[in-house]
Amino acid sequence: MIDLNADLGEGFGRWELTDDERLLSVVTSANVACGFHAGDAATMRRVCELAAERGVRIGAQVSYRDLAGFGRRAMDVPPAELAAEVAYQIGALEVFARAAGTRVSYVKPHGALYNRVVHDEGQAGAVVDGVRLADASLPVLGLPGSRLLEVAEKAGLPVVTEAFADRAYTEEGTLVPRGEDGAVVTDPDAVVERSVNLARLGVVDAHSGRRIPVRARSLCLHGDTPGAVELARRVRSRLEASGVRVAAFA
C-alpha cells in the first residue's frame, strides 16, 4: 500500500498555482499551505472543503515565514519562535478543516524547512515542539533517516516516511538541491517508473545512476509542475495496474 500526497492550496488571493480541485480527485492526502509560504484564509477553507468532499486526508504544510521566497529560502529562526509558528499554522488549518467536517491528519514541513530538518536537530526539535503544542497525536511526514523523524519518534509522535517520484536523490538518500541541474525529474515516463519502483521495490535511482534503498509509506507528487494532474493520474493508474493499493496512511 502507498499513499499519494501533493502540495495544494499554494495560491494567494487571485493568483492560483495548483489545480487543487482536479488533483484532489487523484491523491489520497493533501499537504495544504498554511499561509506562511503560500495560501490565504479563503484558499485554505476552499481546499479543506474540496478535500472533505472527496475523502482526502488533510495535512498542514508548515513553512518558514517567507511568502516572497515561497518558503524556499534558508532562514535562521529561533527554536521557540519556530515552534510557535508551526503550532499557529496547524491551528489555522484545523479551524477550516473542522468547519468542513474533517480534521488535520498530519504535518509536513515545506521547502527550506523540510530540507533543513533533515540534518538540523535544533530546527527539527522546534518543529516537533510546535506539533506537540498543537496536537501531540498528529503524525509527522518526512524523509527517511531525517533528524525530524528521529526527534519526532523520540518525542512519542507517529512518523511517516516519504519519497519523491519527481525529485532527484543523492546517494545518501537526500534530495538534490533545487538549484542544481536535474534536481527535478521532468520526464513523465521516468516519474511513473520511479513511482512504481519506490512503491513496489523500495528503491530509486540516485542522480549518480546508483540504485539506493528508499522505504516510504507516502509518495509525493508536486502539484506545481507542468501537467501535474495528468501525471498524477498516470502514476496512480500505473501503481494500481502493478498491484499496489493506493490509500491514505492516516
Curated annotation (Swiss-Prot):
Pfam family for this entry, one: LamB_YcsF
**Is Ribonucleoprotein set as a keyword in this record?**
no
A single GO BP annotation from the record? carbohydrate metabolic process
Q: Which residues form a coiled coil?
A: none
The catalysed reaction is: 5-oxo-L-proline + ATP + 2 H2O = L-glutamate + ADP + phosphate + H(+)
Q: What is its EC number?
A: 3.5.2.9
Q: Which GO terms describe its molecular function?
A: 5-oxoprolinase (ATP-hydrolyzing) activity; ATP binding
What's the domain of life for this entry? Answer: Bacteria
Record CDD domains: LamB_YcsF_like
- Which keywords does this chain's UniProt record carry? ATP-binding, Hydrolase, Nucleotide-binding
EC class, as a word, reads: hydrolase
What protein family does this chain belong to? Belongs to the LamB/PxpA family.
What does the annotation say about its assembly with partners?
Forms a complex composed of PxpA, PxpB and PxpC.
Q: Which PANTHER family match?
A: 5-OXOPROLINASE SUBUNIT A, UNCHARACTERIZED PROTEIN YBGL-RELATED
Report the protein's function.
Answer: Catalyzes the cleavage of 5-oxoproline to form L-glutamate coupled to the hydrolysis of ATP to ADP and inorganic phosphate.
The protein's name is: 5-oxoprolinase subunit A
Specify the species. Answer: Streptomyces avermitilis (strain ATCC 31267 / DSM 46492 / JCM 5070 / NBRC 14893 / NCIMB 12804 / NRRL 8165 / MA-4680)
Q: What is the lineage of its organism?
A: Bacteria, Bacillati, Actinomycetota, Actinomycetes, Kitasatosporales
Encoding gene per record: pxpA
